[in-house]
Each structure stands twice: as structure tokens, then as C-alpha cells.
Amino acid sequence: PTAGPEETAAPEPSPEASAAPEASDAPSGGKTLVVYYSATGNTQEAANLIAELTGGDLFELEPADPYTDEDLNYGDENSRVVYEHDNPDARDVALVQDTVDNWDEYDTVFLGYPIWWGIAAWPVDDFVTANDFTGKTVIPFCTSASSGLGESGELLAEVAGTGDWLEGQRFPSRVSREDV
């Protein structure tokens, strides 16, 4: 079953998570950027750990109209996130900033997000469509209590149209240094 936005219970890591590249597998060369959207802080924690381990810079994706706890109540059919889920045209979530200063200096981009109903949380889409990933290696990562990475990375790569998108990694909602 697919789950709503970032659940709280953290199961054991799935086999598919261990088959994906680890943060330490980032290609060597230019600078590393860790871009993330975090609705409840779980993805932010994973992003902080990846940045620490890779020496990467952090860039947080912030919706211009931030999600409240009520907005993220996927059990409430009247919540914002359920409305956006049921109405794909409503998923165009504007960001405070959708481009990164000195974007051309980065060769490796880790892109993090929670899984919402089996796909990347839609605030990430605005960032992906606003940037040219040509010449960049992109490593998606997600946080989820139960859902795997699924096709979220492939779908974002399709939206981007450029870049070398690797398989990626799923982390449990309560990520630890050992998980990364």
C-alpha cells in the first residue's frame, strides 16, 4: 500500500535501500550540493547527514505557501495535500527560491524528499523543472516509514530531461548516521 506524507513509524531498511548508492559513493570531482524538501524534518535530517559525510553544501526547498500540520493531514480528505494528490493540476507548488547560486559549480546533486503516495513530494518538481542538470550526476534520496524509492527518481529524471540520474536511496523516517 502506498502511504501519505512522511509517516512516523520507521521499519527496518528494505533490501532495495541497501542496493542503492550510498552517500560515500558520490562521484569525485567538482562540488557537491544537497538539495532537499522536508515537510516534517525527517528529510532535513538525512540531508544534513549526507552534506556532512560528503562535504556538500545544503539548499532547502521552501514552498512560498508553506504546508501546515493541517495541510499535511493525509487522513483528512479536505486537507491541502489530499486535494493536491487528487488534483494533479494543483501540485504546482511555487518555491521561495527554485534556483541555486553558483549552480554551474556543482557536479553532484543529492536531491531529497519525502515520498507522498509513492512519488516524490511535489514541491520538488518546481526545482527540477527550473534547473538544467546537464553535466551533473543526480542522486535522489527519500525518507519514508514504509514506501520505497519506487519510480520517484525516474519520474524526476523524466521531468528534468537532462543529467545523469542514479538509482538513489530510501532512508527510514528516523534516519541515523549508520543509515547514510
Locate the predicted segments by residue:
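Active-site-proximal alpha-helix that buttresses catalytic centers in soluble enzyme cores
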Residues: P1-V180
